[in-house]
Design a protein with these regions (language model features):
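Short, well-structured alpha-helical interface segments that form or flank functional binding sites
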Residues: 5, 37, 70-74
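Acidic-and-aromatic substrate-binding clefts and catalytic sites of carbohydrate-active enzymes
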Residues: 30-35, 95-99
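Catalytic cores of nucleic-acid endonucleases
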Residues: 52-108
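Acidic-basic catalytic patches of nuclease active cores, encompassing PD-(D/E)XK
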Residues: 1-31
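Charged, low-complexity C-terminal accessory regions
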Residues: 101-132
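Active-site beta-strand-loop-beta-strand hairpin of nuclease catalytic cores
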Residues: 38-55
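Hydrophobic/aromatic beta-strand patches that form the interior of the parallel beta-sheet core
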Residues: 50, 89-90, 115-119
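Flexible, charged surface loops at secondary-structure boundaries
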Residues: 35, 42-45, 81-85
Length: 132
């Protein structure tokens, strides 16, 4: 499966799991000219906003996938910048990434709670890792 196919599968399964109708949506963050925008993988007005990360913690050679780790961490920043009332969720398809990302950011003071979930693509099951 491609990254886009995996994201689509995760979104479909999340909507079934939570009874939502979240879609991939580009949203403006801020006001005025020069307003930043970001494409969130999950969004349903007044319900949920979220990101899906498909990167693994380690790359194929067994070394740290720093690019993937940085991208997964930056998703937390975008979720923190969002000013809406939606619940925030970050879903990761790599179990190692989900656990290590949660551990890395545990204890940090986020302005809004963000749930970290692992999604097992083979069994289509979600596991809550924790809430930041």
């Amino acid at each position: 499966m491609t990254r886009h196919q995996i994201e689509s599968t995760v979104r479909t399964e999340y909507n079934k799991y939570k009874g939502t109708n979240a879609k991939k949506t580009r949203l403006s963050i801020g006001i005025g000219c020069g307003t930043a925008s970001y494409e969130f993988d999950l969004y349903e007005l007044n319900v949920v906003i979220g990101c899906i990360s498909t990167s693994s913690w380690f790359n194929e050679t067994g070394t740290n996938n720093t690019g993937g780790q940085d991208r997964a961490s930056s998703e937390l920043s975008w979720l923190s910048l969002w000013q809406g009332n939606e619940s925030r969720v970050h879903i990761l398809t790599d179990k190692e990434m989900a656990h290590r990302l949660f551990k890395k950011h545990s204890g940090a003071l986020f302005p809004h709670s963000i749930e970290i979930h692992h999604f097992e693509i083979n069994t289509k099951r979600f596991s809550l890792i924790g809430t930041l």
